[in-house]
Amino acid sequence: MTISLARYNFFISLELLKTLVAKGVKYFVLCPGSRSGPLALAAASLSKRKELTLITSIDERSAAFLALGISAASGQVSCVITTSGSAVANLLPAAVEADRSCHPLLFLTADRPLRLKECGANQAVNQQDFLKSVCRHFDESPKEGIHLISKERLTSLVGKSFEMASNIPGPVHINLAYEEPLHPCEIDQNKVLDGWGIEGFLKEKVTPNKVEVFKSFQSLKLPKLDPFSLGIIILGPWRGKVKQLNSFRGALKQWQKLTGWPILADPLSGVENDQEGLINHWDLFFSIGLFEKIKEIQVLRLGPIPPSRELQTWLKKPGKFQLLITEGDCRNLDPIGGSTQFSEGFSCWVDKMLECIPVKPAIDKKIVSQKLTKELIKYDLFINHWLDKRLFRNGLITEPALARLLPRLLPDSIPVMIASSSPIRDWLSYSGEGAFLRRCFGFRGASGIDGTLSMGMGLSIIMGRMVLVTGDLALLHDTNGWLFSKDKNISLIVIMIDNGGGGIFNQLNIDRIKEGDFEEIFLMPQQVCHLTLAKAYGLKYKQVACLDDLEKAIEWSFSLSTNVLIRVCTNSIEDHRLRVNLSDDLKKTLSENLSSFD
């Protein structure tokens, strides 16, 4: 009796997914398609048996960002399954972000067999090349069809791919060719599910392998800093593994206690509010020139550089001895080009430094770095009170006021995702200690607006009730993310800043346009009512007109367990003027009230 090729396809697909599950992959996001039918049937079978969690999505781009959010929050590999053709191209935006942000993500894409390639066959494209430039690793089944794969090759393919996605976290692409017939009949499905197998495929349960970190670090001399001389610590977005964050925080506390150095941290750095030496409003310090008197200083940079232009300008000036430490990422992460890079992780570096630091009197650091830190904290406290008076005095909602007030209205345990463009910049400048009261997430790899809502949904699957702060265009760009609201495990409060388009462009130094309309070619406001759109998706929503309304809306949103939308209307032109005035007035106020440090 001839066994249908469809049965072989289904069996191999089931074995592949079982092997991934055994490795530790729990979440699978499935997109519709015919060529991927065997994978869909296999995923559904394992989901019914509670062996994996299956989420479905009609939009591959949205699906990939949902999986990205799951990976970002859990630190574990999540998987996206798609059919062939342009479906694979839609994975690229999330793959780019996963690569730059170091999140483990696995793409399983079904493909046409070799006989249908390069001959004009429908939906037969060079999809195997679509994601290669940003993936940690690429692998594929036999080009003639996955039914020809051996047990040893399947085990190797899955093992290597999982390892490459996990070690230095990032995206991995596995392309799987399927020969027809694709869809097994009910008899073939039952046979496979009842234990039928291909000769050579072992039946014992696959055991997860312990993933060892692959180190390609060169044996270079340990780059050192003098803890008893003037220094400063600059933290960019966290790019290490989730499970390494606590040891990173411990090493930071240890190094700061030893040195007394001040800490300038990005909201996405993972630093906690109880960290000694933390300067909350450091971005404003640079905008008003408070650091200009510091000519020579050691700079310990942890991770990618924060987006502050003023900070980057300051770092480019002479007198900065810079050491950049990354969490296993050996790629060049220094756009300034003035640092020595150490890629074995901050905890490792601190341990090695402590072994070779000579004991010196504590008075040294008090004279040098602690003086600087105390001065910065003094300025920080002054700015903190000054901003409260300026931003809350009339009850009007502005984007800076929203960034400052919102963290105070949220429970400390509630995570926040902050969208790119104006929201993350205002959070950096105006949120103060609120930026470090909770874990913050965002796109700081490629800094795009692709998939903002979908990633927030994915984060919520792992983190539970949480908040997304986004602009109107970023939300509109990913409205398919609302389709995930059917998932009862997602509980997202979306606070949308409606400033009539791309308000960030009002903050850029764009000269007067000779021909064309600034609003049309940059701001691009859309004639869409987000509240009507929310209603169409079955969401609950509220409109906020003043700061008092915001507090009531937040209380209302936490009384619910479903996804909700809170619309906050602002004026991007007026808010730009406010930011400029705040900087100018603060500089003048400081010169009148505080003496400058040397």
From Swiss-Prot:
Its EC number is 2.2.1.9. It holds the Pfam family TPP_enzyme_N. Keywords: Magnesium, Manganese, Metal-binding, Thiamine pyrophosphate, Transferase. One of its GO terms (molecular function) is magnesium ion binding. CDD domains: TPP_PYR_MenD, TPP_SHCHC_synthase. It catalyses: isochorismate + 2-oxoglutarate + H(+) = 5-enolpyruvoyl-6-hydroxy-2-succinyl-cyclohex-3-ene-1-carboxylate + CO2. Pathway: Quinol/quinone metabolism; 1,4-dihydroxy-2-naphthoate biosynthesis; 1,4-dihydroxy-2-naphthoate from chorismate: step 2/7; Cofactor biosynthesis; phylloquinone biosynthesis. GO terms for biological process: menaquinone biosynthetic process; phylloquinone biosynthetic process. Homodimer. Belongs to the TPP enzyme family. MenD subfamily. Catalyzes the thiamine diphosphate-dependent decarboxylation of 2-oxoglutarate and the subsequent addition of the resulting succinic semialdehyde-thiamine pyrophosphate anion to isochorismate to yield 2-succinyl-5-enolpyruvyl-6-hydroxy-3-cyclohexene-1-carboxylate (SEPHCHC). This is 2-succinyl-5-enolpyruvyl-6-hydroxy-3-cyclohexene-1-carboxylate synthase.
